Amino acid sequence: MFRLNTLSALAELAVGSRWYHGASQPTQTKRRLMLVAFLGASAVTASTGLLWKKAHAESPPCVNSKKPDTEDKERNKDSGEVSSREGRAADAAAEPYPEDKKKKRSGFRDRKVMEYENRIRAYSTPDKIFRYFATLKVINEPGETEVFMTPQDFVRSITPNEKQPEHLGLDQYIIKRFDGKKIAQEREKFADEGSIFYSLGECGLISFSDYIFLTTVLSTPQRNFEIAFKMFDLNGDGEVDMEEFEQVQSIIRSQTSMGMRHRDRPTTGNTLKSGLCSALTTYFFGADLKGKLTIKNFLEFQRKLQHDVLKLEFERHDPVDGRISERQFGGMLLAYSGVQSKKLTAMQRQLKKHFKDGKGLTFQEVENFFTFLKNINDVDTALSFYHMAGASLDKVTMQQVARTVAKVELSDHVCDVVFALFDCDGNGELSNKEFVSIMKQRLMRGLEKPKDMGFTRLMQAMWKCAQETAWDFALPK
């Protein structure tokens, strides 16, 4: 019986095979299309798997594992506990960075958390970045709440490998109750009176709209603002009113990675308000808002902002007698480099070897070098001229380029530190290509990079390629 069933099944298979190959044999074009579809589907599946593995292979333990429950949150509103939590957060943010602390922070959990935070900085939307790194939720007299960043939070949000204080993460804040008088009394607590952050109002705190505006100013070259101002300066007097400046701001923001990724989220309260905050409009256009803003005044605002952010970065390293170590300065230069960890460690070791008992660098020396970096494109051109002329790119050449291009004097000690980092073969000459590429990234603080993993662009390229290939197969020449 089993043999008869097997024979009948084989007979039916033979009949089906003859029918398929005889009556429904696909054409050559259909075979090609089927092959293209199969290859395209395989490529999409493989690419998706690789990107997913890359994004989540090093996923850290949940940073919100110690998130307080509802009762804890209610108790945190008590002023005594708020002040104690605030003190702990301030201590964590202001702790010095000696060598023993670096060893303490190099634990497995801390490394994974910092990697996770770096991915937030690189790939998340502005809304999530702001909610993660902001540390204050202010409750005003009517009972309305708003989330704010301190200037230190702002610098931390754009600086890789700067760990968020413990128990402060996504939607985890220090709650403060302020009335108008208390804000005025504690204004100096978050920003010095001479700081540009003091102009933001709200005791130097940074709202979400301010955060987008400040990152736009930091990530946009000076030349772009000059061109945008000239576009909207219809009468050619070099001035724009408030309405025209809002148009300039909107256009510039749409060209930045932050602006392109932003979507208003009413559920979290992080919506981009039209115009500037009241303190900035008064700063730019006067109390009656009828003044005019010149490109010179705006570029001065940009320069002050860059100066204050650099000053905060400098102070985070806990300078001793107004000086930071050579290794800390090297860390500032390489913070946004994207250099592989092994090479980065080797460069830091080389720096430590050269300056075991170094005298350190003052803020003025650091600021002069970063003024030199603001003209990095012109510096690149000048160094290329030296290279094509056959001249060696030594320390004297760098100082000459700084005087010619940026009108600043670089000290011999600063040049020694830079050459210790970028003199790969130890012959006293600069590796100018790597130096220029890393310094361009440092100047823009990584804010010019697209805030995505490239998956969308990959899928668009694959779809376009599949369409063109299928068309070529369907209509062969």
Swiss-Prot record:
- Region C-helix region, as annotated, extends over 457-467
Q: How is it modified after translation?
A: Phosphorylation at Ser-124 by AKT1 impairs its maturation and stability. Asymmetric dimethylation at Arg-457 by PRMT1 decreases the calcium sensitivity of MICU1 by promoting interaction with UCP2.
Q: Basic and acidic residues: which segments have biased composition?
A: 66-89
One molecular function GO term is: identical protein binding
The gene behind this protein is Micu1
Q: What's said on domains?
A: The EF-hand domains have high affinity for calcium and act as sensors of calcium levels.
Q: Which UniProt keywords apply?
A: Calcium, Calcium transport, Disulfide bond, Ion transport, Membrane, Metal-binding, Methylation, Mitochondrion, Mitochondrion inner membrane, Phosphoprotein, Repeat, Transit peptide, Transport
Q: Which residues carry this modification: Phosphoserine?
A: 124
- What is the name listed in the Swiss-Prot or TrEMBL entry for this protein? Calcium uptake protein 1, mitochondrial
CDD domains annotated for this entry? EFh_MICU1 (cd16173)
Phenotype upon knockout is:
Lethality during the first hours after birth in most cases: embryos are at the expected Mendelian ratio and death takes place only after birth. Some mice survive beyond the first postnatal week and show severe neurological and myopathic defects. Cells display increased resting mitochondrial calcium levels, altered mitochondrial morphology and reduced ATP. Cells also show disorganized mitochondrial architecture.
Subunit description:
Heterodimer; disulfide-linked; heterodimerizes with MICU2 or MICU3. Homodimer; disulfide-linked. Component of the uniplex complex, composed of MCU, EMRE/SMDT1, MICU1 and MICU2 (or MICU3) in a 4:4:1:1 stoichiometry. The composition of calcium sensors within the uniplex complex can differ depending on tissues: a MICU1 homodimer can be present instead of the MICU1-MICU2 heterodimer in skeletal-muscle and kidney. MICU1 is recruited to the uniplex complex by EMRE/SMDT1, and it associates with MCU at low calcium levels, occluding the pore of the MCU channel. Associates with the MICOS complex.
Q: What does this protein do?
A: Calcium sensor of the mitochondrial calcium uniporter (MCU) channel, which senses calcium level via its EF-hand domains. MICU1 and MICU2 (or MICU3) form a disulfide-linked heterodimer that stimulates and inhibits MCU activity, depending on the concentration of calcium. At low calcium levels, MICU1 occludes the pore of the MCU channel, preventing mitochondrial calcium uptake.
Q: Which GO terms describe its biological process?
A: calcium import into the mitochondrion; calcium ion import; cellular response to calcium ion; cellular response to calcium ion starvation; mitochondrial calcium ion homeostasis; mitochondrial calcium ion transmembrane transport; positive regulation of cristae formation; positive regulation of mitochondrial calcium ion concentration
GO cellular component, alphabetical, reads:
calcium channel complex; mitochondrial crista junction; mitochondrial inner membrane; mitochondrial intermembrane space; mitochondrial membrane; mitochondrion; uniplex complex
Query: Which classification does the entry list for the species?
Result: Eukaryota, Metazoa, Chordata, Craniata, Vertebrata
Q: Where is this region: Polybasic region?
A: 101-112
Which Pfam family, giving just one, matches this sequence? EF-hand_5
Note down the stretches annotated as region K/R-ring. 128-131, 261-265
Q: In which tissues is it expressed?
A: Expressed in skeletal muscle, heart, kidney, liver, brain, lung, fat and spleen.
Ranges of residues in domain EF-hand: 220-255, 356-376, 410-445
Subcellular locations according to the entry: Mitochondrion intermembrane space; Mitochondrion inner membrane
